């Protein structure tokens, strides 16, 4: 009887290892994609900055351009923080709903 369960247990262990590896790869891929996007944005930012800065501009004019760009980016960050909070709240609400649904099914089985 024990021998009959052993291959099944090994199959379960292999499934768990494979599933964990797949999840780890997904996280690593997402991390690398984020790094690619971040660096592409940096390149674009430098290109945009080069378009604004002209020969003979004063240091004050360049600083004003940078300050304006910084303000715009800070506004975007604030918007994304608010959006992320809204999404997190919705995720928590769905988790509570799923938990309640799961508990309801468990009670019905008894």
UniProtKB/Swiss-Prot annotation:
List the coiled-coil residues: 15-42
Disulphide bridges, residue numbers:
none
- Please give the superkingdom of this protein's source: Bacteria
Keyword field contains Cytoplasm: yes
Question: Which key words tag this protein in UniProt?
Answer: Coiled coil, Cytoplasm
Q: Which family does it belong to?
A: Belongs to the pole-localizer TmaR family.
Q: Which PANTHER family match?
A: UPF0265 PROTEIN YEEX
Name of the protein: Pole-localizer protein TmaR
């Amino acid at each position: 009887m024990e021998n009959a369960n052993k291959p099944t247990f090994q199959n379960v262990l292999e499934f768990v290892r494979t599933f964990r590896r797949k999840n780890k790869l997904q996280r690593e891929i997402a991390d690398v994609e984020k790094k690619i996007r971040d660096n592409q944005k940096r390149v674009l930012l430098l290109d945009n900055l080069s378009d604004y800065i002209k020969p003979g501009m004063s240091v004050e004019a360049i600083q004003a351009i940078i300050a304006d760009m910084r303000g715009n980016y800070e506004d975007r960050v604030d918007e994304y923080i608010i959006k992320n909070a809204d999404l997190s709240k919705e995720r928590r609400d769905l988790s509570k709903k799923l938990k309640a649904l799961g508990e309801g099914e468990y009670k019905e089985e008894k």
